[in-house]
């Protein structure tokens, strides 16, 4: 697999790279739809979500995995959303149609890159979509874990413990990586404490 650092750009190639960077830069301005639908103020962007996922891929221990590949998967897995937007379950778009739109978007995005990078980024996206490797399965759990961590943070910021329970419900039973299970357990314990404390406070 070619390394991203191996590519060189000049002339027309540099213009295409600039176009690619502007395109993926739109992810900074694509809000995560689930938060929008729940009326979260100043919801995070898709880029925000993928950044913390990439950090999680770096720091959550698993010597059996290719961690460099995990980071790359985290950075690419939602890249198509710079064109198609963040399609949420509440949008009621069939999974096959969502995949078709994102596949077309990834082909459009990667067309701006040299052949080796085009192949690498598209194959990373496809690997995540098909969950065809241990690394892809790990990153999928990071995706879910990052989401509920963000939900907890929004509850804290709003001083409304438990308001985003449906995000937790949607991930029930989906974690099996030992380190992620431990992290989720700690998060849920903290959150349960906050919910209990809020329930015991006298209401004015």
From Swiss-Prot:
- Name any cofactors this protein relies on: Mn(2+); Co(2+); Mg(2+)
EC number assigned by the record: 3.1.3.89
Superkingdom, natural source = Eukaryota
One Pfam family from the UniProt entry? HD_3
The note describing how and how many cofactors are bound reads: Binds 2 divalent metal cations. Shows activity with Mn(2+), Co(2+) and Mg(2+) but shows no activity with Zn(2+).
Q: Name one GO molecular function term.
A: 5'-deoxynucleotidase activity
Q: Does the keyword Cell cycle apply?
A: no
Q: Which residues form a coiled coil?
A: none
Where is the PTM N-acetylalanine found along the chain? 2
What positions does the domain HD occupy? 46-148
Which residues bind a divalent metal cation 1 per the record?
Answer: 49, 77-78, 143
**Which keywords describe this protein according to UniProt?**
Acetylation, Cobalt, Hydrolase, Magnesium, Manganese, Metal-binding, Phosphoprotein
Which reaction(s) are listed as its catalytic activity? Answer: a 2'-deoxyribonucleoside 5'-phosphate + H2O = a 2'-deoxyribonucleoside + phosphate
Subunit architecture: Homodimer.
Instruction: Name the family the entry cites.
Output: Belongs to the HDDC2 family.
Put simply, this protein is called 5'-deoxynucleotidase HDDC2
């Amino acid at each position: 697999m070619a390394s991203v650092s191996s590519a060189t750009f000049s002339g027309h190639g540099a213009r295409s790279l600039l176009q690619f960077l502007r395109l993926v830069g739109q992810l900074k301005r694509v809000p995560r739809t689930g938060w929008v639908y729940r009326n979260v103020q100043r919801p995070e962007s898709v880029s925000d979500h993928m950044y913390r996922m990439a950090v999680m891929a770096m720091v959550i221990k698993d010597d059996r995995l290719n961690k460099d590949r995990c980071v790359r998967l985290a950075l690419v897995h939602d890249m198509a959303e710079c064109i198609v937007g963040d399609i949420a379950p509440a949008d009621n778009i069939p999974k096959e149609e969502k995949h078709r739109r994102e596949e077309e978007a990834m082909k459009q995005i990667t067309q701006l890159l040299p052949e080796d990078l085009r192949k690498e980024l598209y194959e990373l996206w496809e690997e995540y979509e098909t969950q065809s490797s241990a690394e892809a399965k790990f990153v999928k759990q990071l995706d879910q874990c990052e989401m509920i961590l963000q939900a907890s943070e929004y509850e804290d910021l709003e001083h409304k413990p438990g308001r985003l329970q449906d995000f937790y419900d949607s991930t029930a039973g989906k974690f099996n990586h030992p380190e992620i299970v431990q992290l989720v357990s700690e998060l849920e314990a903290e959150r349960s404490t906050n919910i209990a404390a809020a329930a015991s406070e006298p209401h004015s």
